[in-house]
Amino acid sequence: MFKRILVPTDGSELTAKAVAAAIDLAKAVGASVYTLSVKEPFPYSAISEMQPVPPQEFFDAQERIAAERVNIVRTACKAAALACEAHTIEAVHPWEAIIEHAKTNGCDLIVMSSHGRSGVTALLLGSETQKVLTHSTIPVLVVR
């Protein structure tokens, strides 16, 4: 069955459902949990004087937020007596980072939440979950 389950987190309420499902599944099959929070890169501007936040402040804030997100998952895993490996990385395209992280860590399942978009909104905006589903060779469990 599954040995290593990756559950990416963006800190949302919907992601919390995916985390709970990943923990339940990991307990049932004896798997370990990996969690990942993807940080946004700094939005450099051609007009450097117009930056709303200095780059270092931006990076520090992104790291703090990402660390808080993975620590929530780590704490939930600890409460369930599960091993959890937590990582934060920076990427332009979170879906690519999620797939690459799963491959690099030998994960055999990715658990993600569906953000519930439908119709034209889903078509125009897409979602990281949809992109992972489309491009991943690793099985993906989508929690709604």
Predicted regions, residues:
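Structural beta-alpha unit
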Residues: T75-I110
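Glycine-rich, Arg-bearing micro-motifs that act as flexible, cationic patches
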Residues: L109-T134
